[in-house]
Amino acid sequence: MDYLQAMRLREANRLMIAKFKKESPANDSPEQRLVRLTNENPQYNVDFLFHSYSKDWFVSDVGMKMSNVMIPNQMLALDCEMVLCEDGTEGVVRVGAVDRNLKVILDEFVKPHKPVVDYRTAITGVTAEDVQKATLSLVDIQEKLRPFLSAGAILIDHPIVIDTSLVFKYPNSRKLRRPSLNTLCMSVLGYEVQKAGVSHHCVHDAAAAMKLALAVIKKRVDTTITLTKEAEKSRLFLHRIPHHLSSEELKKDLALKFFPKNFTIDVKPAKTQGGYYCAVVIFGSSVEANQAFENVNGYKETDSSGLPQKLISCSISTFYVR
């Protein structure tokens, strides 16, 4: 596909989406309502305002074929495992997809086209050996998915077109915070999809996103979610952790600093090379979490939301806990 053709397709798709936004919400199908909830969220453009066209992009021709805005019910949930590449960008190394019936239609490793510096195995479950055995490129994956998207199917993930992190929300007092996929699964579906200390699986995460969308479509569950007070208060959030402090070193430091010592850590990797990362420390109860926060040595202050936090020092750096 050449540049001009891609731009024509993109413009046709843009016009189709613009027409959809002008349509009355009263005419929406349940599936379209979720798309609208995603598109109308104030944070949507923050995540989805991309460049007009990039070399490796696949641009569909849906807008060229459809004279009227579609009323689709075909949905596809997708999830990817990402690694950190040598140039500081992220690369896709595994893709999983399920259909509306939760049937697995894709679960493949992807051969990255850039050198990898961090496989994030503890998070992704992907090893260097897995990637070395991969034979499919990202273009191959696009071609495998293309038949499932050709009829204007809706893409679901945390986060993609139906972005479950934008569909579901916390109460107004916490409107800038987005619920994690695990939080949504515990609150809406009643189970953990990502257990602390256990690596992710893209097929399981894709299936969880599909189940969340179906819960709204079929069961009409409330999209305003809250953690139980006990579950919310049993966690401490660590942020602005420097990249040179490895997750293993972090765990060793916390084992020395935190009391009680019976806790698990869920690390969220940095998006860019050299960037800060964050982590959630999960205790058995709110009492234990409060004890750990009060017992740890650090400079006490408040964050931008007015929540108490501490700047604590470790063997080679500092970070915040709240």
From Swiss-Prot:
The annotated consequence of gene deletion is:
Plants do not show a phenotype alteration due to the redundancy with other SDN ribonucleases.
Q: Where is the Exonuclease domain?
A: 75-213
Annotated GO molecular function terms are: exonuclease activity; nucleic acid binding
Keywords for the protein's UniProt record, in alphabetical order: Exonuclease, Hydrolase, Nuclease, Nucleus
Where is this chain's protein located in or outside the cell? Nucleus
Can you cite an annotated GO cellular component? nucleus
Indicate where this protein is primarily found.
nucleus
The EC number(s) this enzyme carries = 3.1.-.-
Top-level taxon of origin: Eukaryota
Q: Which family does it belong to?
A: Belongs to the REXO1/REXO3 family.
Task: Tell me the function of this protein.
Answer: Putative 3'-5' exonuclease degrading single-stranded small RNAs.
> In its UniProt entry, what is this protein called?
Putative small RNA degrading nuclease 4
Species annotation: Arabidopsis thaliana
